């Protein structure tokens, strides 16, 4: 079991390890000594491996301890039985440090020759309590404590064992036996102090291990006088078998025999405390106690209690220095101590301060509500101690649950009744103590709606909850603890999570005066998830927090005034950030360091009340959608509980905003507690059981909490440790090492420099703190003034009338108060520059809604225009006098109650217009029911009107279908008649030809004989043709008769349907006029709500100037009625239907869009790609319908439903040649000529894929190329399909996709290209570097692709329905999105350094590719290059600023800093010049071709590499300036890369040799030479700083260069030929972007 695994839970222990007065320990000396040894060894494990000079010091430190149990004899000499008097011989080492230890000061007369001093521990039994003890069965505690680096000369065997006897002195506790203080000064009394306890807590569940707890209310043991504890580094006992067996006797006998087994598995993963498992550790576990032991609390910020369970020591390899030292020393010689000071100063506090802690779970049972008492609800929840019992009323099954703490708030008369104070003291107060120690803490409340969560967390004014008590206690403790050495700074934030969106409750509008937009969650690589742009306000007193809390709660009420926005559906998160600044003195200097604690107090949303509405699943669906956070929270808790059982599972933190933000609180760095509130009533049994199971799983979560210290604390500890080393080395002059002494002094200097830098930063932060505090105060005043207009009053006048808000959530009712001043008070919509006295938000609130007049104590309300204003449920249209208690509803969703204090004082009774029911409470339910009753007739009229309109639309559809059928049959009849006429004309021609033949026969009698055979043949042919024509004529007439019969049937069926619907319409009209009771419509609150929602949707659509109209669509029959929402697009002439659930979700999106004043994603709120659109038949005359329009209307569901059983066969071409008969043609008249092209298309796609697979490596493209190719396929496919649709014949009966193989192929290719686009984009974007610009472009590209998919769906749906307007609109939007998306791809390709082969041979491609598409790609490349160069310039400025802040120690570092600054400026000039060149090429040159963009893309990786190398080189330089060791080879590599890349850029800047070009070329050459010189000088300075031997040559060089510089002033030349880097001076006339020296004049620039 490792430190981060589960601690033992104790059902009877106090929360968060509150100490028990019955517990004590007898393992302090044993476990502390072993722990101290592990700690000291782990502290130096890394530095000894890295620095061989410190290994000699490491051997002294590992062996050095103040006391060791007598090691003067070898193990073989030790007796096999313990000393009868119970003595343990301890040895105390000599020391030269007289200031570090009290024992050393008492024994100054001890000489250095004394190698050993006896020290004994004696155990005596108390005579007065002997009867209470049973026979002590002593099982020895055998454990292996192998000390690394020890040999036989230490007198300690590697298999040494310890024998510890533990007895019980009280019930259910372990008490160390008392030891009297002997007269011998070498004897130490081991007293059982209640403030120092160590206990084994009884496991509360099966399969849980026993953990050792360490508790202290005083400083840790290591910081006490050494006369109280044994600080032993070596333990010598008899060689027994390695077994840990602790047996405790007492009233509740508790046998722990599996401790060793569990501890042996432990591996401490913190602070390099990795330990090996002993070779043999056989134990067993027995639990016979009935009473559980209370857990202890350790307020000290350490992990001692976690380390107590780790009794194995990792053996350190022997060092050769230590071995040689031991060979030369005598057998019993022990090395002197050097680090007692270090132990006294730092051993008392564990610098790691990491603790494993499980989530503490508490359950609170609330009392019955008034409603439950009236209904006489039965109690099903009972409590006995910490056990909660639930009895199911139906199944009679009994459920038992045990938690850390159980609060019984059901009955105030109960002896264990838990009040608000009890809940805070037991659950929240320990969290506050842990927060002062530097841990993050979290407390969240969970339970169903109405179970008491908000009461527990916030409470009321007379009974405050956890949050107000926590804040008040926080500042009271801060006032007590704040001193000159310790100061406190506290910040707070308050936000809510509603519908997966975060709203800041402390800010009501943004900087532009608009409503604050939802915030986003980001994740920091170190500090974890955080809310971006969340306001953090500094608070200095509890009054500040009270005012901010009140403001936040009232803002929450303001946001929840809408009918659909329920506050019970949102989670509120209250966060405090406490920073403790502590001052310490090191060598007389004052240093500060900080400890930060983050406190989260969370009120989760209520769980779904689905069990009370089994018949309706809409409520449950809404809850699943809105409360996604609760569902994900359950998943996270379940996964974490499985992880606690050593299972590797995925934790879905990021599926919800709430769990993402609580990542550290659940399984991370936090001390977390949870309180689950439940109802005792039988009606809530299912929610109660669900909550208890939820809480039971949360108990298994293990957090790894650590103290949040800054770097100063670590630096101060290291500085003190180094100072202590030097003092010890000075006292021990015989073992002094000059090299080591010099290194220690150098390290102290480095640490002091770091510390001073940190202090400068902290001073700057202190100044920022003050500025933030002043800004917070100003912002609070501004928010108060703004919120007064929104009903948030902090000061109330008891004489003025007022309006108080009513809300469905009782927690938010009566939170807003609007004062009615003397005179006129105007009410209107909330706007940035609005002058209204009362400003309300909402779609149905008009700009000027109403006016309230208060004259002489009489208050009246006057509506303005058509604004919806209701008084006591009645819609008013004129001035109305308000009386005390009246209900005022504005806009349909703002509910208020009117209060008139003057009328109440005068004793006036409410007006007679109040109904008898109005004597009850005037709450939201009362006002809602009153409005519903008053508006019942209006709602009934709306519903009947909607049903009547639906019937009329159906009749209109049938009439259209009838007329369309009539047109189709008329066209068929005309076709048959024309065919008959053609056949008759052919028959007449044949008869005339026969007559002509007879005349010819008479004239040619002389040829009769010759033509006799021909005559017979012709007569036979004429007879056959005549018969054939007669048969065809007969068949045509028969077909005409059949169609006439079918036509008559169609007309008869349509007429019957028309008469049926006409009768229903007549009945509806009669019921509407006569108000017949036989036709009633049940009016419910949902109908009223739906009417308001439709009005809101139409108002939003009208104000945003969209073309969507929403209406109610009711279809009723004898059995049931179906209500849906019809959505019409007036621009495209199409309509669709939404379900009520979908309409509610879309309306929420519309509201959000309306509040944000519209955005580029506005279309998504009004339409959905999944919608099934159809042609709108409303107001569509039949005479205007073309063949294509008729074909699209036939696909309308309302029209096609009428003709479902009647099929009209199409008329085929009956033309036949003379050579073919009727039987040959009849087989093809009704055959389906369309064939399936799908297999062939798929075959071609597979072939093209194989061709791509077979391409050579030279033809490979990047992912960016593939993305652009996919966009190009979609781009061309849209144009081709749209063109084919336009060219289709208007009178064609075929669908666009039915017979055109090319269109089918294009459609499939477009769909495949989009799929490939999505897959490639996910891979490509996941590989991008983390950057603000890249992240923004990545989000925008994702959004564009999502919108493209939606418009492609609409485009194909329009093609299937033959709706031209829909096709054109979708194509236009999709083309715009494609062009914008390829711009983003071009920018990202440049920023990522990816090549674009697509631009190769761009001029040739432009002929076949759309020119707009190529221009979009090139525009993206140009923008990407601009962003890249700007980021390079910004990075150069950042590096200059960072380098400028560094201090220099000598001339070498000063020169190194100067050269580095010059190098940065040179590269900054490269970026600036490249930016100018790129812009000049794009703007000034007309022949800027695609090849230029290709070169631009190829340059991008070089700029990225140059930026990276510069950043890395400056980091190395800064590290060297700070005194840290750096890698010279890495710096050389970076500088060499910079020189090569700069050389390429300078060659690119060169121009042809002209008069101007030659001058620019010379300037470029000089600048290049300067960069080369700076690079070489920088490397030389760095080598000089890293190598101390080069200091003297550098000084010589520096002196020579100064002399040469003086000579160069007089002679004008530089004759330096000495060591070092030569200094070249170039003089140029004119201006140039170079760095000038001090001797430069305005007309001349000197280059060095």
Curated annotation (Swiss-Prot):
Predominant localisation class: nucleus
UniProt keywords, alphabetically: ATP-binding, Ciliopathy, Coiled coil, Cytoplasm, Cytoskeleton, Disease variant, Meckel syndrome, Microtubule, Motor protein, Nucleotide-binding, Nucleus, Phosphoprotein, Primary microcephaly
InterPro entries membership: 4HB_KIF14, FHA_dom, Kinesin_assoc, Kinesin_motor_CS, Kinesin_motor_dom, Kinesin_motor_dom_sf, P-loop_NTPase, SMAD_FHA_dom_sf
Segments for region (Required for PRC1-binding): 1-356
Coiled-coil residue windows: 705-791, 922-1079, 1332-1348, 1468-1500
Example of a GO biological process term: olfactory bulb development
One Pfam family recorded for the sequence: Kinesin
Binding site for ATP: 447-454
UniProt-annotated stretches for the region Disordered: 1-27, 1600-1648
Listed result of changing residue 459 to R: In MCPH20; uncertain significance
Ranges of residues in domain FHA: 825-891
Subunit structure: Directly interacts with PRC1 within a complex also containing KIF4A, KIF20A and KIF23; targets to the central spindle. Directly interacts with CIT depending on the activation state of the kinase (stronger interaction with the kinase-dead form); targets to the midbody. Interacts with ARRB2; the interaction is detected in the nucleus upon OR1D2 stimulation. Interacts with AKT1; the interaction is detected in the plasma membrane upon INS stimulation and promotes AKT1 phosphorylation. Interacts with SVIL; at midbody during cytokinesis.
Family: Belongs to the TRAFAC class myosin-kinesin ATPase superfamily. Kinesin family.
Recorded domain comment: The kinesin motor domain binds to microtubules with high affinity and has a robust ATPase activity but a very slow motility. The kinesin motor domain protects microtubules from cold depolymerization. Binds to each tubulin heterodimer resulting in a microtubule complexes. Binds at the tubulin intradimer interface, at the crest of the protofilament, and orients slightly toward the next protofilament.
Clinical disorder: Meckel syndrome 12: A form of Meckel syndrome, a disorder characterized by a combination of renal cysts and variably associated features including developmental anomalies of the central nervous system (typically encephalocele), hepatic ductal dysplasia and cysts, and polydactyly. Microcephaly 20, primary, autosomal recessive: A form of microcephaly, a disease defined as a head circumference more than 3 standard deviations below the age, sex and ethnically matched mean. Brain weight is markedly reduced and the cerebral cortex is disproportionately small. MCPH20 features include mild to moderate intellectual disability, autistic features, poor speech. Disease severity is highly variable.
PANTHER family found in the cross-reference section: KINESIN-LIKE PROTEIN KIF14, STAR-RELATED LIPID TRANSFER PROTEIN 9
The protein's name: Kinesin-like protein KIF14
